[in-house]
């Protein structure tokens, strides 16, 4: 390669870096449909995934809505009505995609909005922004502006489209008299594939004019699964005309009367007005961002970290009993099921920054405790055995072809430890007594019945799938055993806090569960492990989050052994986040930085730097990876530590190219921590 090409490439990389340095806004200045991975705007209930096509969104995902269809003979996430699609015609002519020029998009993470701009030939410039309204969990807003380049008649429509998987579609166009005039409602309802759920959505226009001066609306059936309401308007050259569409989407999983509730919610939002809706949404996100991670020294890392926080905040919300799937509300990846990803990887990050949101994730587990107890009973165990994959009712949802359902038992300990950590951070004894203790004690009972008692130090846990999921049918997996011990120990601690009698068998079992080692002192992943490649962190989780291994020399020995066992491709992003965290705590900031970058940069997809599960993967957004990386910043570089007495700070080391990291809004007291 000649010197000139090298210099040109270097200049290009510099320009890309400069463009990417805004801490809050990710811009896509060139839209390539062939290399486009949508980014999600969500409010913890409704997720809207962007599209490379003008006036389209890829799909709309609604938390808590599942039915049995599609993959695996198990429950799957349902795509909801696509209620934000639109069309815009000029002078009655058909839309001509070839006239779309200068199309740009941007995600504003600070305000949780997504904006598209483009020119339509020499006729008009268009800008639209949509929001998944944070203050209204079932509502969305689209804000549109059209600037005429010459005198033109526009026809604008809001389009309601039903996903193909839904059946028994019914479309309505209703008019309701409001306090200032008539409100027109574009409404659809349909059944889920088996008829289990009723899904409903409703839209209304918001005009800036007084209702008496607003454009006249017309209803139009476009297809059996698609209808619209439209208006026409004459614009003079240079004139800008703005309008909005507000909508709601809800199902019978959320309310007993979703059809009427969808229309009620749309009317409620419509009467708040466009400015009122955006103001309340912006205020809600400003409150969320009071808990932030600020990096001084690397603008691109700062933007990337904001993106991870943005997605974690977007995929969860206070006051629910929902937990995020590995892909959050970005689509139907992993069928929308809940795994240990929620409890071990996302929950701790949310717990430190927003305990009130984290509470929703553990509430999800509490409400499904009865199902976990039934699962334990069915497998001959006592207590509660949480399913590897969970959906709406807490029963096992793992497809039969995967053995993780009956054998990946460590998730039960992960749920219990999440409940204990919630108490540790909040110090809420009433919650611990009413909800935490039932979870923690039932999970401890499971482990006491799960072990095989083969003598002192040999309370074995046999025939499991490890956290390293390439290891199936193995005995005494390091993480499973250590997590079980931690569950039993925290149950005893919780009993002491509540002044209730702990089962003495818990401590006996905990003391006798083995953690195996090689002759050279390296912690052994499982009994028959010979040192081969592993899918993801297992042994290293004993140092964090379990704190089973605390000796720095042992932590380092295990790190150096297992970091060389992870293949460069095809493994999930969380592992490198744990390496980052542990190396930072060991004082090796530069090695921590290497793994920090390796945890996500090879996984990014254009144009919004969305994270896939694996290096080179194309299945964003991987919220599990984001949760792990945020933990590496909070508990690694930031040195935060969850203890029975609350959040404390331990010694940590920053990368040499970072000046400082500031973590704001930590814990219930909303403290600030700084590391320089």
From Swiss-Prot:
It comes from the Bacteria. Residues 1-20 form the signal peptide. It comes from Mucilaginibacter mallensis. This is Kojibiose hydrolase. GO terms for biological process: carbohydrate metabolic process. Keywords: Carbohydrate metabolism, Glycosidase, Hydrolase, Signal. Optimum pH is 4-5.5. Pfam families: Glyco_hydro_65m, Glyco_hydro_65N. Transmembrane segments: none annotated. It catalyses: kojibiose + H2O = beta-D-glucose + D-glucose. Glycosidase that specifically hydrolyzes kojibiose to beta-glucose and glucose. Besides its activity on kojibiose, is also able to act on alpha-1,2-oligoglucans with a higher degree of polymerization. Shows weak activity on nigerose, but is not capable of breaking down trehalose, maltose, isomaltose, sucrose, isomaltulose, turanose or melezitose. Optimum temperature is 30 degrees Celsius. GO terms for molecular function: carbohydrate binding; glycosyltransferase activity; hydrolase activity, hydrolyzing O-glycosyl compounds. It is an enzyme of class 3 (hydrolase). The active site is at 469 (proton donor), 613 (proton acceptor). Belongs to the glycosyl hydrolase 65 family. The lineage of its organism: Bacteria, Pseudomonadati, Bacteroidota, Sphingobacteriia, Sphingobacteriales.
């Amino acid at each position: 390669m000649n010197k000139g090409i090298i210099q040109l490439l270097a200049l290009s990389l510099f320009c890309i870096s400069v463009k990417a340095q805004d801490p809050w806004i990710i811009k896509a200045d060139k839209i390539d449909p062939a290399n486009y991975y949508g980014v999600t705007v969500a409010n913890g209930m409704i997720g809207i995934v962007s599209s490379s096509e003008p006036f389209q969104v890829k799909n709309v995902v609604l938390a808590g809505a599942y039915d049995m269809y599609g993959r695996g003979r198990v429950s799957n996430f349902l795509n909801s009505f696509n209620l934000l699609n639109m069309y815009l015609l000029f002078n009655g002519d058909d839309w001509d995609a070839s006239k779309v020029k200068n199309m740009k998009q941007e995600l504003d993470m600070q305000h949780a909005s997504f904006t598209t701009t483009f020119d339509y030939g020499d006729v008009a410039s268009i800008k639209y922004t949509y929001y998944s309204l944070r203050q209204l969990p079932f509502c969305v807003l689209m804000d549109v502006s059209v600037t005429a380049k010459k005198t033109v008649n526009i026809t604008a429509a809001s389009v309601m489209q039903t996903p193909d998987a839904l059946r028994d579609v019914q479309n309505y166009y209703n008019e309701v008299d409001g306090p200032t005039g008539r409100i027109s409602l574009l409404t659809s309802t349909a059944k889920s594939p088996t008829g289990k759920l009723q899904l409903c959505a409703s839209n209304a226009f918001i005009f800036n004019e007084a209702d008496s001066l607003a454009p006249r609306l017309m209803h139009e059936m476009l297809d059996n699964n698609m209808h619209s309401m439209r208006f026409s308007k004459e614009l003079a050259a240079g004139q800008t005309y703005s309008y909005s569409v507000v909508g709601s989407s809800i199902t019978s999983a959320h309310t007993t009367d979703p059809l009427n509730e969808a229309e009620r919610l749309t009317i409620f939002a419509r009467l708040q007005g466009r400015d009122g809706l955006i103001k309340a949404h912006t205020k809600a996100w400003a409150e969320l961002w009071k808990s932030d991670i600020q990096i001084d020294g690397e603008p691109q890392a700062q933007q990337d970290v904001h993106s991870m926080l943005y997605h974690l905040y977007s995929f969860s919300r206070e006051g629910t009993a929902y937990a995020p799937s590995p892909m959050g509300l970005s689509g139907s990846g992993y069928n929308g099921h809940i795994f240990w990803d929620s409890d071990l990887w996302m929950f701790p990050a949310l717990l430190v920054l927003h305990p009130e949101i984290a509470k929703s994730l553990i509430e999800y587990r509490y409400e499904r405790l009865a199902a976990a107890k039934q699962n334990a009973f069915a497998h001959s165990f006592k207590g509660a055995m949480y399913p590897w994959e969970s959906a709406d009712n807490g029963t096992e949802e793992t497809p039969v072809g995967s053995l993780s359902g009956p054998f990946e038992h460590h998730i039960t300990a992960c749920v219990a430890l999440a409940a204990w950590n919630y108490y540790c951070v909040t110090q809420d004894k009433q919650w611990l007594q009413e909800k935490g203790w039932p979870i923690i004690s039932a999970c401890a009972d499971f482990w006491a019945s799960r072990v095989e008692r083969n003598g002192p130090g040999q309370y074995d846990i046999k025939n499991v799938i490890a956290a390293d999921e390439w290891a199936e049918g193995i005995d005494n997996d390091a993480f499973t055993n250590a997590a079980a011990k931690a569950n039993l120990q925290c149950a005893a601690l919780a009993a002491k806090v509540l002044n209730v009698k702990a089962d003495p068998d818990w401590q006996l079992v905990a003391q006798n569960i083995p953690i195996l080692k090689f002759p050279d002192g390296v912690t052994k992943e499982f009994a028959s492990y010979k040192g081969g490649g592993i899918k993801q962190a297992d042994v290293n989780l004993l140092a964090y989050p379990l704190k089973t291994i605390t000796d720095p020399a042992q932590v380092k020995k295990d790190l150096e052994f297992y970091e060389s066992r992870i293949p460069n491709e095809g493994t999930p992003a969380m592992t490198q986040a744990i390496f980052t965290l542990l190396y930072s705590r060991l004082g090796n900031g530069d090695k921590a930085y290497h793994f920090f970058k390796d945890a996500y940069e090879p996984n990014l997809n254009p144009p919004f730097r969305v994270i896939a599960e694996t290096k080179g993967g194309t299945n964003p957004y991987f919220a599990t990876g984001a949760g792990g990386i945020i933990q590496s910043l909070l508990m690694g570089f930031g040195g935060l530590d969850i203890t029975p007495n609350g959040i404390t700070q331990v010694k940590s080391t920053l990368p040499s190219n970072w000046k400082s990291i500031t973590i704001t809004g930590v814990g219930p007291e909303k403290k600030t921590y700084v590391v320089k």
